[in-house]
Protein backbone atom coordinates (compact mmCIF):
# COMPACT_ATOMS: atom_id res chain seq x y z
CA UNK A 1 0.00 0.00 0.00
CA UNK A 2 1.88 3.03 1.37
CA UNK A 3 2.75 5.54 -1.40
CA UNK A 4 0.21 3.90 -3.73
CA UNK A 5 -2.53 5.38 -1.56
CA UNK A 6 -1.29 8.89 -2.41
CA UNK A 7 -1.11 8.12 -6.14
CA UNK A 8 -4.58 6.58 -6.12
CA UNK A 9 -6.06 9.52 -4.25
CA UNK A 10 -4.65 12.10 -6.68
CA UNK A 11 -5.79 10.01 -9.66
CA UNK A 12 -9.32 9.94 -8.20
CA UNK A 13 -9.25 13.71 -7.60
CA UNK A 14 -8.14 14.30 -11.19
CA UNK A 15 -11.00 12.11 -12.44
CA UNK A 16 -13.42 14.20 -10.36
CA UNK A 17 -11.86 17.46 -11.66
CA UNK A 18 -11.29 18.84 -8.20
CA UNK A 19 -8.42 19.69 -5.92
CA UNK A 20 -7.72 17.70 -2.80
CA UNK A 21 -8.21 19.07 0.69
CA UNK A 22 -5.21 18.30 2.90
CA UNK A 23 -5.49 18.84 6.65
CA UNK A 24 -2.64 19.22 9.13
CA UNK A 25 -2.81 18.53 12.86
CA UNK A 26 -0.08 17.98 15.45
CA UNK A 27 0.13 14.60 17.18
CA UNK A 28 -0.58 14.84 20.91
CA UNK A 29 -2.21 18.28 20.73
CA UNK A 30 -3.75 18.51 23.27
CA UNK A 31 -3.40 14.75 23.92
CA UNK A 32 -3.14 11.45 22.05
CA UNK A 33 -6.80 10.47 22.51
CA UNK A 34 -8.04 13.76 21.04
CA UNK A 35 -5.64 13.51 18.10
CA UNK A 36 -6.93 10.02 17.30
CA UNK A 37 -10.53 11.19 17.57
CA UNK A 38 -9.79 14.09 15.18
CA UNK A 39 -7.92 11.82 12.74
CA UNK A 40 -10.83 9.36 12.64
CA UNK A 41 -13.30 12.18 11.92
CA UNK A 42 -11.31 14.09 9.29
CA UNK A 43 -12.12 11.92 6.23
CA UNK A 44 -15.88 12.25 6.82
CA UNK A 45 -15.38 16.01 7.30
CA UNK A 46 -13.88 16.15 3.80
CA UNK A 47 -10.14 15.60 4.22
CA UNK A 48 -8.68 13.82 1.18
CA UNK A 49 -5.20 13.48 2.65
CA UNK A 50 -3.99 14.02 6.22
CA UNK A 51 -0.69 15.50 7.34
CA UNK A 52 0.20 14.56 10.90
CA UNK A 53 2.95 16.54 12.59
CA UNK A 54 5.26 14.91 15.11
CA UNK A 55 6.34 17.41 17.76
CA UNK A 56 9.89 18.70 17.96
CA UNK A 57 11.43 21.13 20.44
CA UNK A 58 12.76 23.56 17.80
CA UNK A 59 10.23 23.78 14.93
CA UNK A 60 12.02 26.58 13.06
CA UNK A 61 9.76 26.74 9.98
CA UNK A 62 6.60 27.15 12.02
CA UNK A 63 4.76 30.26 13.07
CA UNK A 64 3.51 30.79 16.63
CA UNK A 65 0.38 28.62 16.16
CA UNK A 66 2.23 25.42 15.24
CA UNK A 67 5.09 26.15 17.64
CA UNK A 68 2.58 26.21 20.50
CA UNK A 69 1.00 23.00 19.17
CA UNK A 70 4.43 21.32 19.21
CA UNK A 71 4.95 22.46 22.80
CA UNK A 72 1.54 21.08 23.80
CA UNK A 73 2.33 17.82 22.01
CA UNK A 74 5.65 17.43 23.81
CA UNK A 75 4.02 18.33 27.12
CA UNK A 76 1.42 15.59 26.60
CA UNK A 77 4.28 13.10 26.18
CA UNK A 78 3.96 12.63 22.41
CA UNK A 79 6.97 11.14 20.61
CA UNK A 80 7.73 9.98 17.09
CA UNK A 81 6.88 6.41 18.15
CA UNK A 82 3.65 7.67 19.71
CA UNK A 83 2.83 9.38 16.41
CA UNK A 84 3.35 6.09 14.55
CA UNK A 85 1.08 4.38 17.08
CA UNK A 86 -1.65 6.93 16.30
CA UNK A 87 -1.33 6.15 12.58
CA UNK A 88 -1.59 2.41 13.28
CA UNK A 89 -4.73 3.00 15.37
CA UNK A 90 -6.23 5.16 12.60
CA UNK A 91 -5.47 2.45 10.02
CA UNK A 92 -7.58 -0.08 11.95
CA UNK A 93 -10.65 1.75 10.64
CA UNK A 94 -9.37 3.48 7.48
CA UNK A 95 -7.28 1.81 4.79
CA UNK A 96 -7.87 4.47 2.12
CA UNK A 97 -6.96 7.95 3.39
CA UNK A 98 -3.28 8.79 2.81
CA UNK A 99 -1.34 9.92 5.87
CA UNK A 100 1.82 11.97 5.56
CA UNK A 101 4.03 12.57 8.57
CA UNK A 102 5.53 16.06 8.76
CA UNK A 103 8.30 17.21 11.02
CA UNK A 104 12.02 17.64 11.55
CA UNK A 105 15.00 15.41 10.89
CA UNK A 106 16.36 14.92 14.40
CA UNK A 107 13.74 12.46 15.76
CA UNK A 108 13.93 10.39 12.54
CA UNK A 109 17.74 10.42 12.64
CA UNK A 110 17.67 9.25 16.27
CA UNK A 111 15.55 6.23 15.32
CA UNK A 112 17.76 5.41 12.33
CA UNK A 113 16.45 5.81 8.79
CA UNK A 114 15.94 2.09 8.06
CA UNK A 115 14.30 1.41 11.42
CA UNK A 116 12.03 4.44 11.06
CA UNK A 117 11.02 3.54 7.50
CA UNK A 118 10.16 -0.04 8.48
CA UNK A 119 8.11 1.09 11.49
CA UNK A 120 6.36 3.81 9.46
CA UNK A 121 5.42 1.37 6.70
CA UNK A 122 4.11 -1.12 9.26
CA UNK A 123 1.99 1.61 10.90
CA UNK A 124 0.50 2.63 7.55
CA UNK A 125 2.34 5.88 6.80
CA UNK A 126 2.27 6.87 3.11
CA UNK A 127 4.64 9.81 2.93
CA UNK A 128 7.10 11.92 4.86
CA UNK A 129 7.86 15.65 4.76
CA UNK A 130 11.06 16.67 6.54
CA UNK A 131 11.32 20.42 6.77
CA UNK A 132 15.02 20.70 7.57
CA UNK A 133 16.60 18.04 5.34
CA UNK A 134 18.07 19.60 2.18
CA UNK A 135 17.95 17.40 -0.94
CA UNK A 136 21.77 17.30 -1.11
CA UNK A 137 21.81 15.38 2.18
CA UNK A 138 18.66 13.30 1.73
CA UNK A 139 19.86 10.26 -0.24
CA UNK A 140 20.25 7.92 2.78
CA UNK A 141 16.74 8.84 3.94
CA UNK A 142 15.38 8.50 0.39
CA UNK A 143 16.97 5.04 0.09
CA UNK A 144 15.35 3.85 3.33
CA UNK A 145 11.91 5.23 2.45
CA UNK A 146 11.96 3.95 -1.14
CA UNK A 147 12.78 0.46 0.13
CA UNK A 148 9.50 0.56 2.12
CA UNK A 149 7.43 2.28 -0.58
CA UNK A 150 7.05 5.53 1.36
CA UNK A 151 7.04 8.85 -0.52
CA UNK A 152 9.55 11.55 0.41
CA UNK A 153 7.69 14.76 -0.33
CA UNK A 154 9.77 17.86 -0.99
CA UNK A 155 9.07 21.48 -0.22
CA UNK A 156 9.52 24.09 -2.95
CA UNK A 157 9.28 27.81 -2.21
CA UNK A 158 8.84 31.07 -4.14
CA UNK A 159 12.61 31.44 -3.73
CA UNK A 160 13.38 28.08 -5.44
CA UNK A 161 15.02 29.20 -8.70
CA UNK A 162 15.49 27.29 -11.97
CA UNK A 163 19.01 26.24 -11.03
CA UNK A 164 17.83 24.76 -7.74
CA UNK A 165 14.56 23.18 -8.85
CA UNK A 166 15.94 19.97 -10.46
CA UNK A 167 17.71 19.11 -7.19
CA UNK A 168 14.54 19.78 -5.19
CA UNK A 169 12.33 17.51 -7.31
CA UNK A 170 14.92 14.74 -7.73
CA UNK A 171 13.69 11.62 -5.92
CA UNK A 172 10.51 13.39 -4.89
CA UNK A 173 7.41 11.21 -5.02
CA UNK A 174 3.73 11.41 -4.09
CA UNK A 175 3.42 15.14 -4.67
CA UNK A 176 5.40 18.36 -4.40
CA UNK A 177 4.51 20.70 -1.53
CA UNK A 178 4.64 24.33 -2.62
CA UNK A 179 5.24 26.75 0.23
CA UNK A 180 3.20 29.62 -1.15
CA UNK A 181 4.59 32.34 1.10
CA UNK A 182 8.17 32.91 2.19
CA UNK A 183 8.63 32.68 5.94
CA UNK A 184 6.95 30.60 8.62
CA UNK A 185 3.62 28.77 8.63
CA UNK A 186 0.31 30.45 9.27
CA UNK A 187 1.48 34.09 9.36
CA UNK A 188 1.05 35.51 5.85
CA UNK A 189 -1.67 34.70 3.31
CA UNK A 190 -1.28 32.93 -0.01
CA UNK A 191 -1.84 34.99 -3.17
CA UNK A 192 -3.65 32.86 -5.77
CA UNK A 193 -2.35 35.03 -8.64
CA UNK A 194 1.23 34.12 -7.69
CA UNK A 195 0.37 30.50 -6.99
CA UNK A 196 -0.94 29.57 -10.48
CA UNK A 197 2.33 30.03 -12.45
CA UNK A 198 4.34 28.45 -9.63
CA UNK A 199 2.12 25.35 -9.63
CA UNK A 200 2.46 24.99 -13.41
CA UNK A 201 6.24 25.30 -13.19
CA UNK A 202 6.46 22.64 -10.48
CA UNK A 203 4.15 20.25 -12.33
CA UNK A 204 6.36 20.53 -15.43
CA UNK A 205 9.58 20.04 -13.48
CA UNK A 206 8.39 17.09 -11.39
CA UNK A 207 5.57 15.39 -13.32
CA UNK A 208 3.77 15.18 -9.96
CA UNK A 209 0.69 16.78 -8.41
CA UNK A 210 1.35 20.01 -6.53
CA UNK A 211 -0.15 20.77 -3.12
CA UNK A 212 -0.06 24.35 -1.86
CA UNK A 213 0.21 25.27 1.80
CA UNK A 214 1.57 27.82 4.33
CA UNK A 215 -0.89 30.73 4.21
CA UNK A 216 -4.35 29.23 3.59
CA UNK A 217 -6.63 30.05 6.51
CA UNK A 218 -10.10 30.86 5.16
CA UNK A 219 -12.59 29.07 2.88
CA UNK A 220 -12.10 31.81 0.25
CA UNK A 221 -8.33 31.37 0.25
CA UNK A 222 -8.71 27.59 0.09
CA UNK A 223 -11.10 27.87 -2.87
CA UNK A 224 -8.80 30.27 -4.73
CA UNK A 225 -5.86 27.87 -4.39
CA UNK A 226 -8.04 24.85 -5.24
CA UNK A 227 -8.88 26.42 -8.61
CA UNK A 228 -5.25 26.17 -9.73
CA UNK A 229 -3.44 23.61 -7.53
CA UNK A 230 -3.87 19.85 -7.18
CA UNK A 231 -4.46 20.24 -3.44
CA UNK A 232 -4.84 22.92 -0.78
CA UNK A 233 -3.22 22.35 2.61
CA UNK A 234 -4.66 23.92 5.76
CA UNK A 235 -2.83 23.64 9.08
CA UNK A 236 -2.70 26.72 11.29
CA UNK A 237 -6.43 27.47 10.95
CA UNK A 238 -7.26 23.96 12.25
CA UNK A 239 -4.64 24.08 14.99
CA UNK A 240 -6.07 27.44 16.12
CA UNK A 241 -9.45 25.72 16.56
CA UNK A 242 -7.85 22.97 18.64
CA UNK A 243 -6.09 25.52 20.83
CA UNK A 244 -9.12 27.75 21.44
CA UNK A 245 -11.51 24.82 22.05
CA UNK A 246 -9.10 23.27 24.56
CA UNK A 247 -8.69 26.60 26.38
CA UNK A 248 -12.47 27.07 26.58
CA UNK A 249 -13.09 23.44 27.61
CA UNK A 250 -15.17 22.91 24.46
CA UNK A 251 -15.33 19.69 22.46
CA UNK A 252 -12.05 19.89 20.52
CA UNK A 253 -12.93 17.18 18.00
CA UNK A 254 -16.29 18.75 17.21
CA UNK A 255 -14.83 22.23 16.72
CA UNK A 256 -11.93 21.18 14.49
CA UNK A 257 -14.09 18.89 12.33
CA UNK A 258 -16.62 21.69 11.84
CA UNK A 259 -13.84 24.03 10.65
CA UNK A 260 -12.43 21.28 8.41
CA UNK A 261 -15.86 20.71 6.91
CA UNK A 262 -16.25 24.42 6.02
CA UNK A 263 -12.86 24.45 4.32
CA UNK A 264 -13.49 21.14 2.54
CA UNK A 265 -16.74 22.47 1.05
CA UNK A 266 -14.89 25.50 -0.31
CA UNK A 267 -12.21 23.30 -1.90
CA UNK A 268 -14.77 20.89 -3.39
CA UNK A 269 -16.87 23.65 -4.94
CA UNK A 270 -13.93 25.68 -6.28
CA UNK A 271 -13.99 24.17 -9.78
CA UNK A 272 -17.72 23.53 -10.12
CA UNK A 273 -18.76 24.43 -13.66
CA UNK A 274 -15.19 24.29 -15.01
CA UNK A 275 -13.64 21.64 -17.23
UniProtKB/Swiss-Prot annotation:
Record field: catalytic activity: (1S,2R)-1-C-(indol-3-yl)glycerol 3-phosphate + L-serine = D-glyceraldehyde 3-phosphate + L-tryptophan + H2O
EC number: 4.2.1.20
Active site: 51 (proton acceptor), 62 (proton acceptor)
GO cellular component terms, semicolon-separated: cytosol
Superkingdom, natural source: Bacteria
Pathway: Amino-acid biosynthesis; L-tryptophan biosynthesis; L-tryptophan from chorismate: step 5/5
The entry's keywords: Amino-acid biosynthesis, Aromatic amino acid biosynthesis, Lyase, Tryptophan biosynthesis
Molecular function GO terms recorded: tryptophan synthase activity
Cystine crosslinks: none
NCBIfam families, alphabetized: trpA
Family label: Belongs to the TrpA family.
Summary of the function given for this chain in its UniProt record: The alpha subunit is responsible for the aldol cleavage of indoleglycerol phosphate to indole and glyceraldehyde 3-phosphate.
HAMAP family tied to this protein: Trp_synth_alpha
Subunit structure: Tetramer of two alpha and two beta chains.
Name this polypeptide is given: Tryptophan synthase alpha chain
Amino acid sequence: MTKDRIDRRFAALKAENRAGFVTYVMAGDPDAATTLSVLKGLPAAGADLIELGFPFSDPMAEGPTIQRAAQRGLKSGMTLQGTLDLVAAFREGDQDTPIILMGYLNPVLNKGFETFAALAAKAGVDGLIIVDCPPEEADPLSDALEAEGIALIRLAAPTTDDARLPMVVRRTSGFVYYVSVAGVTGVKSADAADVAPAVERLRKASGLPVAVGFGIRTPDQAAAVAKVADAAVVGSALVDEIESAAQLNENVTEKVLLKASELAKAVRSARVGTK
